[in-house]
Structure formats: C-alpha cells, structure tokens
C-alpha cells in the first residue's frame, strides 16, 4: 500500500522554514562535537532546504510495536502527559522531541529470542497449527510464514551470536537496561550448571573419578547455598520500568525511497601548514545539492508518543525481504560485452550524496589545495555517521503528540 505526501504543506510556509532551521541547527551542533582532522579548523552548517521532490513511501506492514518502545522514559514519565492534558491546549507538543539510544544490536536480538521462547511455550499446545503459533504476529510478514518462532530471520541472527557473546565477559553489557535482556538466556544456561543430584547407580563413576565428581558436587552445592543467601553469581538487576501495552498500540513498517534535490550548505576552514604549521585558514564551501536514499522506517504510536527510526540494511532485508536480483543487461559504449545488472538491496540508507565545492581560484580551473578531496570525503562521512547514529535502530526518536 502506497501513500501520497503533500510535500509542499510539510516543507512550505513558516512551519516548513522552522523545520528546516531546526534540522540545520541539529546538524551544526553535531559537527561541533566531531573530532576534526588536523587540516580542518572548523565546520559550520549555514542552511538547509527540503527541496521540491518528495519521498516515495510504501507501507509494508502494520504490526505491534517493538519492545524497546515500551521502555519508560525517566525524563518524560506518563504522569507528565496526564498533567499536560489537564493543562489544556496551551502547550505545543511539536516542540517536545526526544532522541534516545536503545541497546546494541546483539542484546536486542537476544530480547527477540527470549520473547519468542515465551510465545512458543504459550502456543505449544495449540492444535491444528504445525510448529505452534509463535511466528503469528511476528511483524505479520510473508517472510515469516511457515517458520517457527526460533527460526525467524532476526532470531536466526541472534542465535548465531548468542553463545559467543555470552561466553565473552568483555562483551556483556553493564547497564541495567541491557542486563534485563539477558535474564531469559541466563535462566536457560543455568540449567547446565547444577549436576544431577541423584545419579543412576548403573552410571556411577569409577573410583578414580569419584573424588573429582564429589568435589564438583560440593562446589555446586556451595553455589546453590550462596544463591539462597543472596550471593548469586548472576548480578540481580532491577528491571527497567515498562509502559503497559494497549490494543490501540500500532506500528507501521514502511519502505522509504528518495531521490531529490535536498540542499545543505556547509563551510569547512582548511588550515595551511606553509610556511609554518597552521599558517592560515581558507574557507571551503560545500554545497550538498541532492541525495539518494533507500531505507525501511518504523513508526510506532503508543499512547501519546510517536516513535520513529530507520532499520539497518541487514535488519531491513530480514524484515521486508530483498529486492536484489536480475535487472537486465548493460552494454558498453559499442553495444558489446553485455553484463548483468543487479538491483540494489533494500534499505541501503544514504546511497549517494551529490556535493559541489567552492574555493578561491576555482574559476581558473587550477587545483588550489590538495586537501579539498579529503575535506569533501570527511564531511560526507560525518553526514552519514550523524544520520546512522541518530536515526538508525537501536537509536530512535520519540515525539510527544
């Protein structure tokens, strides 16, 4: 299902200018936090314009929100929303926007595996459905049809990384939010820590191994005793408060494509090291004149909050499938040497950024500075990094509506 966007209404007028200025200031502030290379003194963002082309949006699925969207935000609790309701319509909800960093991908995948374990146990006795109903309502996608809850795409990714990550003490998260993701995995692994308390007499070990078995048994019993007195080897962490789920909660999965004339103007001051180090700074103006974007977006509405983010290319391909495939033949200038052309994968995010540079002496066609190419590459890389750090899951934006 596709939808039309009134791009002029969103980007035009006073409201559109205010949105453009908000984006400009946001990108400018992010550049001030970046560690610059030695040949760049500063970077300033001067303007941002949405352009005239609108993105193409295709709704892929409507499903339940991700678990991370239910985490309680200490800065904006639910009771504050109730206070806003009582205060009337004086407050402007458009000004209330929160950016939040979720857990890393590994712990999110473990959370999805644990969630599917719970669902598979609850639906194991459902008659007439092979494999149970654990994959029903799992993003409601055709890709998950016929798969059990443990073999859905993200679960397969999580299972491949689960064992090695749990065995690595340096890879375990230390925050309470991340530790909450491990509670199910720890409960499953703990089943193998305690030996059998009453072994079969026919399988009793020989005398030379009996001492080692008794020693291991005593160590296990001491661990159990320590756990009963509150000295469990797994640190107990209070669970992160979660909002109550509601049947009205909804999440939209959409494929977003954009190839337009979005514009942004930046200035980078290049330092000259001749005749001495940092002798003088020359401004280099970079004009981004357009970009090509392909991504999968999540938009969830929970109570009075709207959560928005994009998915990484791997997650996007796992959730909505891949459009990669044969896309015809391409020949050279002579019409020979036909080569197959592959369609790009879905969810590649920022695929191309068009940029023009302006510096003194450009009109004469001479190369003024050899670092111009390096500056362009650095600025474009930072633009990509800012986008991925702020808008790609597990990072997401929350709007109070």
Swiss-Prot record:
UniProt biased composition (Basic and acidic residues): 209-220
Gene Ontology CC entries for this record: endoplasmic reticulum membrane; ERMES complex
Subcellular localization(s) per the UniProt record: Mitochondrion outer membrane; Endoplasmic reticulum membrane
Bias-annotated ranges (Acidic residues): 70-88
Bias (Low complexity): 195-205
Domain (SMP-LTD): residue spans on this chain: 1-401
PROSITE patterns, A to Z: SMP
CDD domains with a match to the protein in the record: SMP_Mdm12 (cd21672)
Chain segments carrying region Disordered: 70-95, 190-247
Record GO terms (molecular function): lipid binding
Lipid bilayer topology: Peripheral membrane protein
Keywords, in A-Z order: Endoplasmic reticulum, Lipid transport, Lipid-binding, Membrane, Mitochondrion, Mitochondrion outer membrane, Transport
Domain description: The SMP-LTD domain is a barrel-like domain that can bind various types of glycerophospholipids in its interior and mediate their transfer between two adjacent bilayers.
Stated family: Belongs to the MDM12 family.
The protein's assembly and partners: Component of the ER-mitochondria encounter structure (ERMES) or MDM complex, composed of MMM1, MDM10, MDM12 and MDM34. A MMM1 homodimer associates with one molecule of MDM12 on each side in a pairwise head-to-tail manner, and the SMP-LTD domains of MMM1 and MDM12 generate a continuous hydrophobic tunnel for phospholipid trafficking.
Full protein name: Mitochondrial distribution and morphology protein 12
């Amino acid at each position: 299902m596709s939808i039309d966007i009134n791009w002029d209404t969103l980007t035009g007028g006073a409201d559109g200018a205010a949105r453009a200025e908000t984006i400009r200031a946001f990108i400018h502030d992010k550049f001030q936090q970046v560690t610059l290379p030695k040949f760049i003194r500063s970077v300033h963002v001067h303007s941002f314009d949405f352009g005239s082309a609108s993105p193409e949006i295709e709704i892929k699925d409507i499903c339940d929100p991700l678990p991370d969207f239910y985490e309680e935000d200490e800065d904006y609790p639910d009771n504050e929303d109730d206070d806003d309701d009582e205060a009337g319509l004086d407050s402007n909800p458009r000004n209330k926007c929160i950016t939040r960093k979720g857990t890393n991908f590994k712990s999110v995948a473990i959370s999805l595996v644990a969630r599917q374990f719970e669902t598979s146990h609850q639906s194991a006795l459902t008659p007439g459905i092979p494999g149970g109903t654990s994959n029903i309502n799992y993003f409601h996608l055709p890709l998950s049809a016929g798969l059990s809850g443990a073999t859905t795409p993200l679960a397969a990714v999580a299972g491949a990384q689960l064992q090695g990550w749990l065995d690595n003490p340096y890879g375990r998260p230390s925050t309470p939010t991340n530790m909450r993701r491990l509670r199910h995995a720890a409960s499953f692994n703990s089943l193998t820590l305690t030996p059998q308390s009453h072994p079969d007499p026919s399988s009793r070990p020989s005398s030379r191994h009996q001492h080692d078995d008794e020693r291991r048994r005593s160590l296990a019993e001491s661990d159990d005793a320590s756990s009963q007195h509150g000295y469990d080897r797994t640190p107990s962490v209070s669970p992160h408060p979660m909002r109550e789920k509601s049947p009205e909660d909804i999440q939209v999965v959409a494929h977003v494509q954009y190839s337009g004339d979005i514009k942004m103007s930046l200035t980078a001051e290049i330092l000259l090291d001749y005749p001495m180090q940092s002798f003088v700074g020359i401004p280099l103006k970079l004009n981004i004149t357009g970009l090509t974007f392909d991504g999968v977006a999540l938009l969830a509405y929970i109570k009075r909050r709207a959560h928005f983010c994009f998915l990484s290319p791997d997650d996007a391909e796992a959730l909505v499938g891949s459009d990669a495939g044969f896309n015809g033949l391409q020949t050279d200038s002579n019409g020979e040497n036909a080569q197959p052309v592959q369609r790009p994968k879905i969810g590649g995010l920022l695929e191309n950024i068009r940029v023009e540079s302006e510096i003194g002496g450009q009109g004469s066609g001479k190369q003024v500075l050899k670092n111009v190419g390096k500056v362009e590459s650095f600025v474009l890389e930072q633009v990509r990094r800012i986008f991925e750090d702020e808008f790609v899951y597990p990072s997401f934006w929350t709007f109070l509506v």
